[in-house]
C-alpha cells in the first residue's frame, strides 16, 4: 500500500492528504508514503501515470485506487475493507466500523 501525498504520514501538508493518511493510520494499515512536494518529477509523473489530476493518490498492490473523495466514499461504504481483504492487506475491522458509525448520522 503506497500513498502519494503532499507531506508525510506523520506531517501531511494538505487537508486531503491528511484525511487519507488519517484513515489508513486509524485502520492500522501499513503503508509507504511518498512526499510529492519533495520532487516535482514524481509529482507530475504520478499524475501522468494514473491519468488522475490530483494528490493524494492511493495504490494497493500496484493498482491505483483513487484520491481523497473516492477513498472517503469507499471507507464509508465498506468497499475499502473489501479491497483490502481481496488484496490480502491487514487492517483493523473494528476501526473501520467506528469510522462508519461516526459518519452515520
Segments from the language model and where they lie:
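Short amphipathic alpha-helices and their capping/turn residues within compact interaction modules
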Residues: 1, 25, 29, 51, ...
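Local sequence-structure signature of Cys/Sec-based thiol-disulfide redox active-site neighborhoods
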Residues: 1-30
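Structural micro-motif
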Residues: 1-2, 50-61, 66-69
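Eukaryotic short linear interaction motifs
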Residues: 10-13, 42-43, 73, 92
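Alpha-helical interaction elements in eukaryotic regulators
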Residues: 16, 38, 42, 51, ...
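Thiol-based oxidoreductase modules, predominantly thioredoxin-like and allied folds used
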Residues: 25-45, 49, 53
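Non-catalytic, surface beta->alpha helical segment in thiol-disulfide oxidoreductase systems
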Residues: 60-95
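Mature, matrix/stroma-exposed regions of nuclear-encoded mitochondrial and chloroplast proteins
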Residues: 91-105
Amino acid at each position: 500500500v503506497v500513498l502519494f501525498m503532499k507531506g508525510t504520514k506523520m506531517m501531511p501538508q494538505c487537508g486531503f492528504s491528511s484525511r487519507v493518511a488519517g484513515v489508513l493510520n486509524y485502520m492500522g494499515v501499513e503503508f509507504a508514503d511518498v512526499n510529492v512536494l519533495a520532487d516535482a518529477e514524481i509529482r507530475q509523473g504520478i499524475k501522468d501515470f494514473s491519468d488522475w489530476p490530483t494528490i493524494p493518490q492511493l495504490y494497493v498492490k500496484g493498482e491505483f485506487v483513487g484520491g481523497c473523495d473516492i477513498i472517503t466514499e469507499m471507507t464509508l461504504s465498506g468497499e475499502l475493507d473489501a479491497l483490502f481483504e481481496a488484496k490480502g492487506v491487514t487492517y483493523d475491522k473494528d476501526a473501520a466500523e467506528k469510522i462508519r458509525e461516526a459518519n452515520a448520522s
